[in-house]
């Protein structure tokens, strides 16, 4: 009798499979809540009676958290991809591809053709842990999330790169009232996208596909999304009952070939030895040495408090502040002396409007006839929704609300850091107004919600979890990395047997390091300031506050109402700006308050925005998801000059039919990357040679999905990923060939030491040729051309085109070259003339100019997500960097300036510092390595010239919530600065 035991110790669960003579006689699956070794012992002990005390057995361990246990117990370890292949070979031999999703691991194994195995690295995006986190965010269990997904009507775009980014997309959807069913299905679609883009990396998933792992077994909604995306029918998509245990079954199969034999008791003894093994890890100094040190710390911070008075004991006028944040809703009512009469702080649970209705009803009851709420203000992510729903008097951007509250506690404040549930906001104060704003871009690294979801996943409340870390003797050093990578650090610490207290303290330190070094990019405490106010609910956690003070080496001010500062600032703003009457709805309307949500897609322009329509009864309605004013009806802002819009229309015009009689061939031009600049050149050149040119359509999300299967790396920027869809689009149009040359150099504008294209722009045609299978037998023209040297280009063009098409003569190529350079020059002149017209309009109408500095392809609406329209909606005239860079001398920069696009941006930044009504907004594509250089230089040029630097990161994430905060904060700071200047000059 042969008994083999396979133990799969994953990142969130432990699985055991017992095989007797080739038949599975026992299988079990349990979450370990980080008690990895103890749970393994428990599962073996539970199978003891079934196996028999003296029965000889073989055992092997697998799984992402299994190696440490296997080493400590001296039990054979099998790598999990190998275990997967073992299981498949025995149980589903016809499989072509295996997709396995675990707690924090994802794998694809290609079994036919060229054998290939791929695993996620240290990123846990698109795995079971991610689904768990999203369920917590929606305040449902994972199984309820699955039920919701099956009632979906539409799919929202949610970033599939990693869990934290997806969270940044989901939260604004919830705040804007999106249906939970649709969000749930969109979460599953994000997992599918992450698996295909992140792991398949250009290799097609086809044939018989076997889906393994807990998430793919338990979640029917996820199964449906995989089947639909991969276009698999039921005959080719396999979801076996063994799915959650397959890797453990593979480990049992592998164990059959090992040498060591055990009895159940000797196996238990080995595992128990592992459970008691000492931990080897990097430690940090403790947060507090003893209770006395902690008491002194608490007493010091207790000094920064605010007066309170019970609302039932107060009589007179009162002012309401609401902070509808990304994960929590806060309400504060203050009296005439700024004392707090009432406050409330709770999780949104995905529906902030319900929370506020409930609390307003309660508040009106407490106020009776004695207290009159005469003014109100709302701030935060849900500001617009709540202002419309409840008739709140004022809406203000959250940075301004937090600054107003901070000034109340520390009049000399010169630096504020606010760590909320999902965002980190830092702002420097100069001359009593906000001078510089740092927001975490598209990443919630080191924010409060990460610690909260982590605490919950380990079975603790956030308060209990954080208290555990206060007196940890040896906090674990988890680094200062993206939170999903930190998950892996925590996993490693768990493998090593670190206690919950050490992990809790280590996480607190990591959150602080992320805020300081990733968001603020501080080099020393002096970069922050002398009078630092910390706020946001996360700083109510003493462990994080202590870590922050230890890291910067100085004491800070934490108001006792740290978590209520946005709402308190809003209440102070309502008091400062009180009007004669309030528009806040009263008890009668509140009693009949209702909130109905429906979704639709706007068809008024090419953005095709997903609109969420919130009806509140009584004729009150709020529409979100729009990037322009059109779907809102009513009075529309005058169409202000917008060079982004003008350039897009101008470039699209090059796609119009040329009417060439008897063309040599129909050549496709992909409408992306550097073709957003060189389209005039190539169109004129090819048409002069006698070709019909066909332009691919303007990018859309659907086009991206069409080409997604051939993207070989998920780390490349979104503009490059879109090129795969453009190639597919041109192939569908039936072109004879596609022309897309490789170009190491750009045109030389003589403002830099060199004139390179970035490597992605320069050589992406090579990558497309290698990865888009349809190009294998297609005429994909990708010669290496350089346009900076006209003579050299002419020589190469003659050789290439006369060699490929004998009917084309040398003199035709020479004539085409002349026409192409002329067309390109005319385009540049048109851009500059249009730019000057826009600037004149702004000057004549006393408007601000937003110089959007980016790359030519940032004009693509699928890449910028309508950011130009969003900025224009605030009453700014839009100009691009290529219209203004030449209006000033080249600025001094502290880096090797060798990129054409970069030198334009530096020139645009200098121009902004010389024009009073111009503001700079830099667009950066996420994943753009060389823009890491430009951002610091652009900031330095702006700040040295007395201007505010604003950066917006753009990628797959289409929700503009964070961008809106940044733009409004910048405009508020500019306005405040002007008011201050007027006062000083008066």
Listing of model-derived features with the role each one plays in the protein:
Residues 4-46, 116-117, 121, 322-362, ...:
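Short glycine-rich, Thr/Ser-proximal phosphate-binding strand/loop in the N-terminal lobe
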Residues 36, 113-154, 162, 244, ...:
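Glycine-rich phosphate-binding loop plus the immediately following alpha-helix
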Residues 128-132, 239-275, 404, 451-453, ...:
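Glycine-rich phosphate-binding/hydrolytic loop that grips phosphoryl groups
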Residues 186-207, 251, 299-308, 362, ...:
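Phosphate/ATP-binding catalytic cores across multiple sugar-kinase/actin-like superfamilies
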Residues 65, 200-229, 240-244, 379-382, ...:
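Glycine-rich phosphate-binding loops at beta-strand->alpha-helix junctions
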Residues 166-197, 488-517:
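Adenine-nucleotide phosphate-binding core of ATP-dependent small-molecule kinases
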Residues 257-317, 425, 576-640:
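Acidic, glycine/GT-rich loop-and beta-edge segments that sit at the periphery of enzyme/chaperone cores
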């Amino acid at each position: 009798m042969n008994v083999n035991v396979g133990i799969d110790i994953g990142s969130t669960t432990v699985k055991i499979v017992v095989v007797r003579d080739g038949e599975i006689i026992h299988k079990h699956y349990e979450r370990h809540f980080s008690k990895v070794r103890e749970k393994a012992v428990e599962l073996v002990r539970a199978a003891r009676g079934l196996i028999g005390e003296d029965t000889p057995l073989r055992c092997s361990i697998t799984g992402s958290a299994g190696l440490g246990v296997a080493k400590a117990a001296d039990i054979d370890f099998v790598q999990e991809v190998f275990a997967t292949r073992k299981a498949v070979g025995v149980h589903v031999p016809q499989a072509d591809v295996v997709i396995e999703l675990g707690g924090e691991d994802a794998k694809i194994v290609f079994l036919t053709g060229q054998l290939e195995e791929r695993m996620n690295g240290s990123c846990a995006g698109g795995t079971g842990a991610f689904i768990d986190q999203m369920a917590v965010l929606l305040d449902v269990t994972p199984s309820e999330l699955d039920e919701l997904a099956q009632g979906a009507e539409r799919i929202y775009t949610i970033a599939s790169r990693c869990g934290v980014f997806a969270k940044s997309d989901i939260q604004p959807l919830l705040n804007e009232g999106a249906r939970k069913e649709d969000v749930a299905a969109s979460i599953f679609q994000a997992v599918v996208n992450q698996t295909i883009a992140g792991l398949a990396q250009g290799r097609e998933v086809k044939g018989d596909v076997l889906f393994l792992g807990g998430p793919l077994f338990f979640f029917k909604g996820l199964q449906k999304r995989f089947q639909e995306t991969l276009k698999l029918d039921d005959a080719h998509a396999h979801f076996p009952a063994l799915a959650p245990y397959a890797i453990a079954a593979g480990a049992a199969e592998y164990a059959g070939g090992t040498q060591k034999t055990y009895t159940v008791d000797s196996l238990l003894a080995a595992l128990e030895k592992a459970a008691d093994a000492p931990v080897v890890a990097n430690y940090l100094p403790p947060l507090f040495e003893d209770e006395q040190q902690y008491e002194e710390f608490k007493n010091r911070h207790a000094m920064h408090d605010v007066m309170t008075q019970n609302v039932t004991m107060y009589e007179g006028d009162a002012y309401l502040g609401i902070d509808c944040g990304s994960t929590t809703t806060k309400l504060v009512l203050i009296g005439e002396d700024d004392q707090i009469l009432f406050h409330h702080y709770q999780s949104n649970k995905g529906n902030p409007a319900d929370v506020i209705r409930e609390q307003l009803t309660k508040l009106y009851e407490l106020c009776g006839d004695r207290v009159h709420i005469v003014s109100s203000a709302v701030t935060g992510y849900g500001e617009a929704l709540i202002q419309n729903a409840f008739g709140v008097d004022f809406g203000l951007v959250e940075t301004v609300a937090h600054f107003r509250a901070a000034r109340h506690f520390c009049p000399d404040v010169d630096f504020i850091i606010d760590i909320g549930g999902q965002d980190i906001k830092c702002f420097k104060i100069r001359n009593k107004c906000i001078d510089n704003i740092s927001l975490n871009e598209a990443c919630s690294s080191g924010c409060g919600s990460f610690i909260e979801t982590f605490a919950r996943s380990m079975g603790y409340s956030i308060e209990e979890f954080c208290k555990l870390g206060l007196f940890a003797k040896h906090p674990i050093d988890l680094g200062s990395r993206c939170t999903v990578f930190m998950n892996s650090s925590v996993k490693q610490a768990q493998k090593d047997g670190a206690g919950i207290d050490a992990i809790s303290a280590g996480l607190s330190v990591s959150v602080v390091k992320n805020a300081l070094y990733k968001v603020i990019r501080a080099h020393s405490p002096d970069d922050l300031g002398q009078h630092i106010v910390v706020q946001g609910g996360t700083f109510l956690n003493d462990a994080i506050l202590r870590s922050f003070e230890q890291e910067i080496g100085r004491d800070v001010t934490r108001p006792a109402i740290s978590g209520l500062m946005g709402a308190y600032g809003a209440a102070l703003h309502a008091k400062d700006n009180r009007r004669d009457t309030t528009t806040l709805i009263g008890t009668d309307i509140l009693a009949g308050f209702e909130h109905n949500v429906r979704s639709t897609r706007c068809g008024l322009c090419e953005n095709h925005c997903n609109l969420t329509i919130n009806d509140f009864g009584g004729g009150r309605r709020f529409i979100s998801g729009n990037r322009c004013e059109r779907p809102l009806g009513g009075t529309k802002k005058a169409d202000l000059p917008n060079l982004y819009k003008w350039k897009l229309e101008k470039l699209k015009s090059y796609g119009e039919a040329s009417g060439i009689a008897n063309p040599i061939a129909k050549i496709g031009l992909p409408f992306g990357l550097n073709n957003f600049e060189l389209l005039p050149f190539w169109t004129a050149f090819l048409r002069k040679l006698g070709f019909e040119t066909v332009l691919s359509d303007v990018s859309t999300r659907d086009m991206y999905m069409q080409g997604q299967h051939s993207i070989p790396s998920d780390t490349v920027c979104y503009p490059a990923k879109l090129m795969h869809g453009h190639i597919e689009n041109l192939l569908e149009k039936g072109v004879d060939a596609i022309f897309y040359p490789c170009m190491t150099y750009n045109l030389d504008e003589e403002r830099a030491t060199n004139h390179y294209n970035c490597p992605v722009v320069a050589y992406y045609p090579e990558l497309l040729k290698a990865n888009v299978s349809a190009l294998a037998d297609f005429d994909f023209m990708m010669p290496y051309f350089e346009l900076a040297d006209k003579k050299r280009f002419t020589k190469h063009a003659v050789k290439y085109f006369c060699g490929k098409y004998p009917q084309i003569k040398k003199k035709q190529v020479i004539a085409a070259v002349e026409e192409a350079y002329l067309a390109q020059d005319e385009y540049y002149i048109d851009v500059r003339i249009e730019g000057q017209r826009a600037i004149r309009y702004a000057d004549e109408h006393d408007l601000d100019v937003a110089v959007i500095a980016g790359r030519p392809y940032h004009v693509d609406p699928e890449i910028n997500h309508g950011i130009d329209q969003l900025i224009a909606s605030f009453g700014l005239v839009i100009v691009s960097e290529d219209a203004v860079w030449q209006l000033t001398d080249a600025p001094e920069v502290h880096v090797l300036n060798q990129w054409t696009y970069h030198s334009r941006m530096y020139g645009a930044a200098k121009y902004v510092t010389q024009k009073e009504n111009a503001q700079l907004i830099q667009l950066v594509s996420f994943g753009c390595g060389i823009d890491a250089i430009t951002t610091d230089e652009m900031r330095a040029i702006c700040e040295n010239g007395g201007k505010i630097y604003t950066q917006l990161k753009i990628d797959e994430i289409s929700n503009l919530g964070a961008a809106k905060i940044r733009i409004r904060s910048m405009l508020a700071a500019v306005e405040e600065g002007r008011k201050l200047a007027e006062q000083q000059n008066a």
